[in-house]
Amino acid sequence: MMSKGVLVGVVTDARRDKTVKVSVYRMVHHKVYKKIVKKCRIYSVHDEHNRCKRGDVVKIREHIPVSATKRWIVVDS
Protein backbone atom coordinates (compact mmCIF):
# COMPACT_ATOMS: atom_id res chain seq x y z
CA MET A 1 0.00 0.00 0.00
CA MET A 2 1.34 3.40 -0.98
CA SER A 3 1.04 6.50 1.12
CA LYS A 4 -1.33 9.31 0.24
CA GLY A 5 -0.09 11.55 -2.55
CA VAL A 6 2.11 8.90 -4.20
CA LEU A 7 1.15 7.41 -7.59
CA VAL A 8 2.75 5.00 -10.06
CA GLY A 9 2.53 5.65 -13.78
CA VAL A 10 4.22 5.37 -17.18
CA VAL A 11 6.16 8.20 -18.82
CA THR A 12 4.40 9.08 -22.09
CA ASP A 13 6.30 12.23 -23.09
CA ALA A 14 9.83 13.30 -22.14
CA ARG A 15 10.65 15.93 -24.77
CA ARG A 16 10.67 19.03 -22.56
CA ASP A 17 13.49 20.08 -20.26
CA LYS A 18 12.91 18.99 -16.63
CA THR A 19 9.30 18.02 -17.37
CA VAL A 20 7.71 14.68 -18.22
CA LYS A 21 4.12 13.65 -18.77
CA VAL A 22 3.08 10.61 -16.75
CA SER A 23 -0.05 8.55 -17.45
CA VAL A 24 -1.60 7.04 -14.32
CA TYR A 25 -4.17 4.29 -14.89
CA ARG A 26 -6.78 3.13 -12.38
CA MET A 27 -9.70 0.73 -12.47
CA VAL A 28 -13.14 2.04 -11.51
CA HIS A 29 -16.55 0.42 -11.28
CA HIS A 30 -19.07 1.90 -13.75
CA LYS A 31 -22.32 2.67 -11.92
CA VAL A 32 -24.69 2.20 -14.86
CA TYR A 33 -23.09 -0.67 -16.79
CA LYS A 34 -21.73 -2.52 -13.72
CA LYS A 35 -18.39 -3.14 -15.40
CA ILE A 36 -14.80 -2.38 -14.52
CA VAL A 37 -13.47 0.50 -16.63
CA LYS A 38 -9.85 1.57 -17.05
CA LYS A 39 -9.43 5.33 -16.49
CA CYS A 40 -6.32 7.34 -17.36
CA ARG A 41 -5.11 10.68 -16.06
CA ILE A 42 -2.05 12.50 -17.40
CA TYR A 43 0.10 14.55 -15.01
CA SER A 44 2.87 17.05 -15.80
CA VAL A 45 5.70 16.03 -13.50
CA HIS A 46 8.95 17.78 -12.56
CA ASP A 47 12.07 15.71 -13.39
CA GLU A 48 15.00 17.73 -12.04
CA HIS A 49 17.83 15.68 -13.60
CA ASN A 50 16.13 14.59 -16.87
CA ARG A 51 16.54 10.90 -15.99
CA CYS A 52 13.18 9.64 -17.23
CA LYS A 53 12.67 8.29 -20.73
CA ARG A 54 9.49 7.42 -22.60
CA GLY A 55 8.10 4.09 -21.38
CA ASP A 56 9.71 4.19 -17.91
CA VAL A 57 7.56 3.21 -14.94
CA VAL A 58 7.97 5.93 -12.31
CA LYS A 59 6.68 6.77 -8.86
CA ILE A 60 5.49 10.37 -8.46
CA ARG A 61 4.68 12.39 -5.35
CA GLU A 62 2.63 15.53 -4.66
CA HIS A 63 4.74 18.64 -4.19
CA ILE A 64 4.35 22.39 -3.92
CA PRO A 65 3.67 24.00 -7.32
CA VAL A 66 6.82 24.17 -9.44
CA SER A 67 5.07 25.95 -12.32
CA ALA A 68 1.55 26.69 -13.53
CA THR A 69 0.83 23.03 -14.36
CA LYS A 70 3.41 21.02 -12.38
CA ARG A 71 2.44 19.93 -8.87
CA TRP A 72 4.13 16.51 -8.86
CA ILE A 73 7.79 15.40 -8.76
CA VAL A 74 9.49 12.13 -9.72
CA VAL A 75 10.46 10.04 -6.68
CA ASP A 76 11.77 6.80 -8.27
CA SER A 77 12.43 6.03 -11.90
UniProtKB/Swiss-Prot annotation:
Provide the taxonomic classification.
Bacteria, Pseudomonadati, Pseudomonadota, Alphaproteobacteria, Rickettsiales
Q: What's a GO cellular component annotated to this UniProt protein?
A: cytosolic small ribosomal subunit
The UniProt record lists the keyword Membrane: no
Q: Note the InterPro entries from the entry.
A: NA-bd_OB-fold, Ribosomal_uS17, Ribosomal_uS17_bact/chlr
Function, in words: One of the primary rRNA binding proteins, it binds specifically to the 5'-end of 16S ribosomal RNA.
What protein name applies here? Small ribosomal subunit protein uS17
What gene is it encoded by?
A: rpsQ
Q: Which terms are listed as keywords in the entry?
A: Ribonucleoprotein, Ribosomal protein, RNA-binding, rRNA-binding
Q: Report the source organism.
A: Anaplasma marginale (strain St. Maries)
Query: NCBIfam families, from UniProt?
Result: PRK05610.1, uS17_bact
Q: How does it assemble?
A: Part of the 30S ribosomal subunit.
Q: According to the lineage, what is the superkingdom?
A: Bacteria
Q: Which family does it belong to?
A: Belongs to the universal ribosomal protein uS17 family.
Write out the GO biological process terms: translation
- Molecular function terms in GO for this entry? rRNA binding; structural constituent of ribosome
